[in-house]
Amino acid sequence: MRIGPVELSAVKDWDPAPGVLVSWHPTPASCAKALAAPVSAVPPSYVQARQIRSFSEQAARGLDHSRLLIASVEVFGHCDLRAMTYVINAHLRRHDTYRSWFELRDTDHIVRHSIADPADIEFVPTTHGEMTSADLRQHIVATPDSLHWDCFSFGVIQRADSFTFYASIDHLHADGQFVGVGLMEFQSMYTALIMGEPPIGLSEAGSYVDFCVRQHEYTSALTVDSPEVRAWIDFAEINNGTFPEFPLPLGDPSVRCGGDLLSMMLMDEQQTQRFESACMAANARFIGGILACIAIAIHELTGADTYFGITPKDIRTPADLMTQGWFTGQIPVTVPVAGLSFNEIARIAQTSFDTGADLAKVPFERVVELSPSLRRPQPLFSLVNFFDAQVGPLSAVTKLFEGLNVGTYSDGRVTYPLSTMVGRFDETAASVLFPDNPVARESVTAYLRAIRSVCMRIANGGTAERVGNVVALSPGRRNNIERMTWRSCRAGDFIDICNLKVANVTVDREA
């Protein structure tokens, strides 16, 4: 799947041309200092703790957990190894997330060790000689796992007149912003040095460790009666006490398999433009329309009259904009579909997304701590990511990398969430990360085809078509959905949810 100049694919589908590999890893002295680093009082962020727990739980089942963010960019010319060594070490010393490693003592006790002096981090280049595409991929995904300090590595693949720069970083220390801000940082520092200029001054990097402190101060003040916590509890209780599962079969989870990524074009450029117009006519944005289409597609595949989804949100503050780290929260989305038109569904989906934005600051694991009857997110919970390269901040990234080949790759291991990624540039495409087995592949193929079918119908003028009623709701489930939907609406919103409620809402969002 391509989003502007950025190609999103599985690493097995990446075919870098053979070349001489030079990779950067820490010196033995750096590794020794990291291993001796004292315990820090700063806990991991909630999303870091989730990654460490899920990695360990999957390993105990004999499964290889997906963990790496891999990004690459093609560069003309020969790599100046001395300049690149400087840039890599400057990057690692600039961002304090790289000074930490984590020790899992038990499921509820994860300890951070922290390197005091950033100068103790030193990466040096190693030349490996000519490698084939397959050998290159194997080397890049062999970056140490989440329980090692050096769970990040960098390299270049040198060819006659160009090279590929890559970064292979454990998600503990990076999120999708690295593909833009991180690569831009590398590019600007490297370009200045090879042009004979002194090292450039970069914007203040901020501190991921400070974010972890702020997050735990905020979550410690929450109670079971906090409105954001109550909203999460309401959502979880209607989904068996946790995040919603993907609604189609995914095969036997006890059978070991890797992960794969399946992509499909949803709409061409003209259809995308018409679809956006349909969203605007429904008083929704593109993301509201996409969530509506996913909800309708799930209804057509399963008969589910209400879609429950999770979508991630970057929770950086303005002070964190240049900070390297994992700043991802989740928003719960509730979208009734039965008996409604696309216009109504898209507007409800948009309202649910917008009014749920504050919930991204509340990690679900904290909600589970406050309400122990709930359960932490289970493997293969359903997650929907949306990337719009027509608006900021992605629009700036696409302009920056215009004319270059930029890639970001899944590492081919078992995914924890089942992630649906929808990307919009001129065209609109979707990719799904899923367990690589025949049952899951069949389900994901049907799922993507259903989404494509709905999107095309809307783009071709089918906004007035109403979704048929399929399954009647039990009284208890009806009450829960009614409560969830009212919570997701603003004053004045008109709701026509099948036979549940018809009202012009005059209550506030916490009613």
Curated annotation (Swiss-Prot):
InterPro entries: CAT-like_dom_sf, Condensatn. It is an enzyme of class 2 (transferase). It holds the Pfam family Condensation. Keywords: Acyltransferase, Cell wall biogenesis/degradation, Lipid biosynthesis, Lipid metabolism, Transferase. Its EC number is 2.3.1.283. Gene3D superfamilies: Chloramphenicol acetyltransferase-like domain (3.30.559.10), Nonribosomal peptide synthetase, condensation domain (3.30.559.30). One of its GO terms (molecular function) is acyltransferase activity. GO terms for biological process: cell wall organization; lipid biosynthetic process. It comes from the Bacteria. It catalyses: a (hydroxy)phthioceranyl-[(hydroxy)phthioceranic acid synthase] + 2'-palmitoyl/stearoyl-2-O-sulfo-alpha,alpha-trehalose = a 3'-(hydroxy)phthioceranyl-2'-palmitoyl/stearoyl-2-O-sulfo-alpha,alpha-trehalose + holo-[(hydroxy)phthioceranic acid synthase]. Required for the biosynthesis of sulfolipid-1 (SL-1), a major mycobacterial cell wall lipid. Catalyzes the acylation of trehalose-2-sulfate-2'-palmitate (SL659) by adding the (hydroxy)phthioceranoyl group at the 3'-position to yield the diacylated intermediate 2-palmitoyl-3-(C43)-phthioceranyl-alpha, alpha'-D-trehalose-2'-sulfate (SL1278). Belongs to the PapA acyltransferase family. This is 2'-acyl-2-O-sulfo-trehalose (hydroxy)phthioceranyltransferase PapA1.
